[in-house]
Swiss-Prot record:
Its main location: plastid. This is Photosystem II protein D1. 2 of the reaction center chlorophylls (ChlD1 and ChlD2) are entirely coordinated by water. Herbicides such as atrazine, BNT, diuron or ioxynil bind in the Q(B) binding site and block subsequent electron transfer. The modification N-acetylthreonine is found at T2. GO terms for biological process: photosynthetic electron transport in photosystem II; response to herbicide. The gene is psbA.
Length: 354
């Protein structure tokens, strides 16, 4: 009898815990994905803040020339970053217990790998939590689908690219100037500006910004006034009201006359789907582009491809970009190698017997 009561009490405790985790009445929804999301994101955030402030220099290139990234070692908010894990570690899983000491772990950039892996797991769980909450509320799953675009982009630069290049040292540093350094080096080594998937990503981001501004301004300009001239038009909206808050017919007519009739949506649902899908698809393509360039399937190369009838090269913008790429690559890891691979491959070592 005692055993039966104890089992019931345990089952009741577990049931109460499950109900609390999956309850949509909580101020913040937790969910089963949240059980993993909360500790991983807290770990990534706390280690990031600590390392950004106080981490010692990291031997990123594996040549015993540490690079400083923290505030206490001379950086500011702009120049500071979490330096990627050393090239000496490569793609090895490098938790604290794999190093001989904490000092060695810090010197080889262990915090970067810890932060990145916890962060990626955390944002993936956040996406799952969005789907879970939508499911429990009877909503459609498109919020999680939209969020998959930035998750894919983060996974591409922090995980897929290092895997393709063979080392976490090639991942994007966690800082402002480190991000720009990553972009410049990526252009130098992969010619990303000439990759069609990057072009689609640019169209997605800038186009999404344009469409968002157009939609917001059209709605704001065609509000149905519920207030007097002396009050703000925004004060006429009541949260949860059933009436339309703006006149879509007026907005449609305005935009149709401004451009042409069929450039304007007459269906609010299709309009908002388009506003969501355009930037999401663009960022998906960018993430796919980064993932292909990770394995050196690079952007188009039109170097010296335009020639006259005599075979002489007519320089184009592609050749200017190529020259800029070589210059950027020369500056990158200047102490790790003397020449970028493009130049080194074209220089034959002198023969001693020749």
């Amino acid at each position: 009898m005692t055993a039966t009561l104890e089992r019931r009490e345990n089952a009741s405790l577990w049931g109460n815990f499950c109900d609390w985790i999956t309850s949509t009445e909580n101020r913040l929804y937790i969910g089963w994905f949240g059980v993993l999301m909360i500790p991983t994101l807290l770990t990534a955030t706390s280690v990031f803040i600590t390392a950004f402030i106080a981490a010692p220099p990291v031997d990123i290139d594996g040549i015993r020339e540490p690079v400083s990234g923290s505030l206490l070692y001379g950086n500011n908010i702009i120049s500071g970053a979490i330096i990627p894990t050393s090239a000496a570690i490569g793609l090895h899983f490098y938790p604290i217990w794999e190093a001989a000491s904490i000092d060695e772990w810090l010197y080889n950039g262990g915090p970067y790998e810890l932060i990145v892996l916890h962060f990626l797991l955390g944002v993936a769980c956040y996406m799952g939590r969005e789907w879970e909450l939508s499911f429990r509320l009877g909503m459609r799953p498109w919020i999680a689908v939209a969020y998959s675009a930035p998750v894919a982009a983060a996974t591409a630069v922090f995980l897929i690219y290092p895997i393709g290049q063979g080392s976490f040292s090639d991942g994007m540093p966690l800082g402002i100037s480190g991000t720009f350094n990553f972009m410049i080096v990526f252009q130098a080594e992969h010619n990303i500006l000439m990759h069609p998937f990057h072009m689609l990503g640019v169209a997605g981001v800038f186009g999404g910004s344009l469409f968002s501004a157009m939609h917001g301004s059209l709605v704001t300009s065609s509000l149905i006034r519920e207030t007097t001239e002396n009050e703000s038009a925004n004060a006429g909206y009541r949260f949860g009201q059933e009436e339309e808050t703006y006149n879509i017919v007026a907005a449609h007519g305005y935009f149709g006359r401004l451009i042409f009739q069929y450039a304007s949506f007459n269906n609010s649902r299709s309009l908002h789907f388009f506003l969501a899908a355009w930037p999401v698809v663009g960022i998906w393509f960018t993430a796919l582009g980064i993932s292909t360039m990770a394995f050196n399937l690079n952007g188009f190369n039109f170097n010296q491809s335009v020639v006259d009838s005599q075979g002489r090269v007519i320089n184009t913008w592609a050749d200017i970009i190529n020259r800029a790429n070589l210059g950027m690559e020369v500056m990158h890891e200047r102490n790790a190698h003397n020449f970028p691979l493009d130049l080194a491959a074209s220089i034959e070592a002198p023969s001693l017997n020749g």
